[in-house]
Amino acid sequence: MQLSLLVGLVCFSAINAKIYFKEDFSDDDWEKRWIKSKHKDDFGKWEISHGKFYGDAVKDKGLKTTQDAKFYSIGAKFDKSFSNKGKSLVIQFSVKHEQDIDCGGGYVKLMASDVNLEDSHGETPYHIMFGPDICGPGTKKVHVIFHYKDRNHMIKKDIRCKDDVFTHLYTLIVNSDNTYEVQIDGEKAESGELEADWDFLPPKKIKDPDAKKPEDWDEREFIDDEDDKKPEDWDKPEHIPDPDAKKPEDWDDEMDGEWEPPMVDNPEYKGEWKPKQKKNPAYKGKWIHPEIEIPDYTPDDNLYVYDDIGAIGFDLWQVKSGTIFDDVIVTDSVEEAKKFGEKTLKITREGEKKKGKKTKKQKKKEKNEKIKKEKMKKRKRANRKKKK
């Protein structure tokens, strides 16, 4: 009976799961669904490509950036806008930086249904921004930014993104109990509570401005032992003249000046004397500033809620182009997102790693050939100079 009930609940959940948007760029009509922004004339151009290495030539086609040092902006509207109130929100997509990106974004933005995608740009309002961002060795993180009460709030935790040349699946799950989870390649990378990990609300408590540390409060756990005295023979110089040094026979005091032996470390040198430490009988521990509750704090059970979700887009800057985005899904079901992402985690990744190894060998070969050519050029230059 219990097993039948469990199966029934799973089936009910699967039947009631809603997919609000899904895109795998597998047909030629993608340009009808995706709108390129005309806000700037020099936005970077997009193309459909499976890249240099892939698992399946058709299934692994995705949206690729093609021009270096460009801003990119493109988006798609949902068939119908929705609210995530009372249910989970799952955003998932794949990213492949096969160009070995040095600086550039790889994130998506979830937006309202009334957004003008033909005029979208970096300042266009959004609900959620999610995905990897890389710039040099210092920035390799996953952005999770929520818009709340006219402000964009960045996550306070540092989530490291993948920085290799292969495809990776990024998943954000926002739950109706105000919790969240970030997954990379189906594995949990971070999780927690929205209120704790973002500065949506003022703190519940603040330090009491009227509280002061007592003047006689001693935080020193150890103090100098006043009975400990410095030994009389303690003070010795750090360096002394080398006793084994001899003045050279050809040394001329009139010509060379007065000879002085070189200095060596003094084996009797003991350094700065410090008295021994003892337990402080007046030690009270570290003083903790008392806190008070603030009247401005009001909890919000709807931190996770967006009433009008109707579009998704890529709005980013890349120094080195070549990133491929694929397998985009927005749903209320973690299971649906997981099923949709299985292709990426199995077929795509396995095929890429086989062909990617070959590509790495080719790169190494090209690098060695380049070094040989440079050496040949140097030899030719050297021979020309000899002839002259």
Swiss-Prot record:
Any signal peptide, and if so, which residues?
Answer: 1-17
Q: Short name of one Pfam family for this protein?
A: Calreticulin
Q: From start to end residue, where is composition biased (Basic residues)?
A: 354-365, 373-388
- Could you tell me where the Acidic residues compositional bias lies? 216-227, 250-259
Q: Residue ranges of region Disordered? A: 193-282, 349-388
Q: Where is this region: 3 X approximate repeats?
A: 257-295
The UniProt entry, under Gene3D superfamilies, shows: 2.60.120.200, Calreticulin/calnexin, P domain
Q: Spell out the residue ranges that the record assigns to sequence repeats.
A: 189-200, 208-219, 225-236, 242-253, 257-267, 271-281, 285-295
Q: At the top level of its lineage, which domain of life is listed?
A: Eukaryota
Q: What is its main location?
A: endoplasmic reticulum
The molecular function terms of the Gene Ontology recorded here are: calcium ion binding; carbohydrate binding; unfolded protein binding
What's in the GO CC field? endoplasmic reticulum lumen; endoplasmic reticulum membrane
Q: What is this protein called?
A: Calreticulin
Q: Which gene encodes it?
A: crt-1
